[in-house]
Amino acid sequence: VGEDEMTPGWTSYRRHLLYQTYDVTEYLQKGINGAGAMLAPGWYKGVMGLTKARNNYGDQTAFTMELLIRYTDGTTESVYTDPSWKGCDSPVVFAEIYDGETYDAALEIPDWSKAETTKGDWKPVQLVFFDTQVMRAQYAAKVRVMDRIPAKRIFKTPAGDTVIDFAQNMAGRIEVTAAGKPGDVIELHCFEVLDKDGNVYLDNLRAAKATMKYTFAREETVTWHPTFTYMGFQYALIVSYPGEPKAENFTACTLHSNMASNGSLE
């Protein structure tokens, strides 16, 4: 729900864990309603820092939710995450802040967050302890997609690589459209600068892979972007793409705090 990205954000989780609130009235329907969430390591347990350590704040991803219902007669009721919830593997088979995201469409479960869903290998969840005293409502601006920048050109480097150029450096992700068949792969490697000869330069990324990858499960046209990562980039190396890539197939989406603009430079 909502337009916020990369929630709950990066904080010192043992001292402050931010939560977000949303009005979900418009999503409710008569009869049985369902809710679900997709989780990734993020800053909490993903690879972070100069030492590339993992599990800096904990070794278990988790999700908690309270649904507060206000009835027309003025009474209220709360529904919480509890042992009755179930979980299963998602199509996001890999997600790291530094290294990117890998998505396998063959693992998709149609309508996975609806109450009537019966497909998928759902298993009981495991309850974990977390000190709720450190939970705080998010008071700062939330991260959102703030600009959409079409690719300016696709070109061949002197070394023969195919590269997308968005004509400005940014923090964000790439939205890609492609037509493929089962097993086809879209793979892009994001980077910031070309070397002095005009070739792909990756040394400043150190060990970060900054790669987004999508594998088709069926013959179709898809528009996809990663959800649990972001990159700093102006360019993207096309490692794999079904068909001939065209500039109109790629859009960069900038991600940053949702703040009002006071001016600009030309």
Please provide the spans of the model-predicted regions.
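Extracellular/oxidizing-compartment recognition motifs
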Residues: V1-E266
